[in-house]
């Protein structure tokens, strides 16, 4: 999201790294709280802290189900598509040159978009659709006993998939919006220079 905003919306590139680190730190701390809160339950369900409960913190191909033959490459494709849809729709919802939702409804609608993507695209890779959302909790789980946090249920290095996929998909989705929709919207009309709006007259009292 942050990279796409910098590439297409004028967000300062010098702020991309601090914003990304802030998101990563937030996800990391949140995962530590979850890990702490469910210490006893996780120890009972999975004493070895294995792939069985890794999905509490981070994504896996087919959500760790070996009966669904999803590899890291299938999951990468899934992440690219899901994040592209997310960014295309976020740009559509927040573009003031179009018909944005009123009364500050944009955050609510973006939340619904994320839920919809999860319901439609969550089977293959758990819909991380944001590097920080996966990497932060994955790091937290690794530091608290999940030695296999970086690998999937097949033993393959998997941590890079929810990082690379959303980066590619985010730029792709934002670019598609700009090419297919954004460039056809009318330009914003600038206010004439030097004019001060006149106050509206007060209604006459009866």
Short names for language-model regions:
Residues 1-206:
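Membrane-interface helix-loop junctions and terminal tails of multi-pass membrane proteins
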């Amino acid at each position: 999201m942050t990279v796409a905003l910098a590439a297409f919306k004028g967000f300062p590139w010098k702020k991309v790294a601090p914003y990304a680190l802030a998101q990563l730190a937030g996800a990391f701390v949140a995962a530590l709280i979850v890990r702490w809160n469910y210490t006893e339950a996780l120890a009972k369900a999975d004493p070895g802290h294995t792939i069985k409960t890794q999905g509490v913190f981070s994504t896996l191909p087919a959500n760790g189900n070996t009966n669904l033959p999803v590899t890291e490459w299938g999951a990468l494709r899934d992440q690219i598509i899901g994040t592209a849809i997310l960014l295309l729709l976020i740009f559509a919802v927040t573009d003031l040159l179009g018909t944005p939702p009123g009364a500050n409804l944009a955050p609510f609608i973006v939340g619904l978009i994320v839920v919809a993507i999860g319901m439609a695209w969550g089977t293959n890779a758990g819909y991380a659709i944001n590097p920080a959302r996966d990497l932060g909790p994955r790091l937290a789980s690794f530091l608290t006993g999940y030695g296999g946090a970086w690998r999937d249920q097949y033993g393959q290095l998997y941590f890079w998939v929810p990082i690379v996929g959303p980066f590619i998909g985010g730029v792709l989705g934002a670019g598609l919006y700009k090419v297919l929709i954004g460039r056809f919207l009318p330009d914003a009309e600038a206010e004439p220079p030097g004019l001060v709006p006149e106050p509206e007259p007060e209604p006459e009292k009866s």
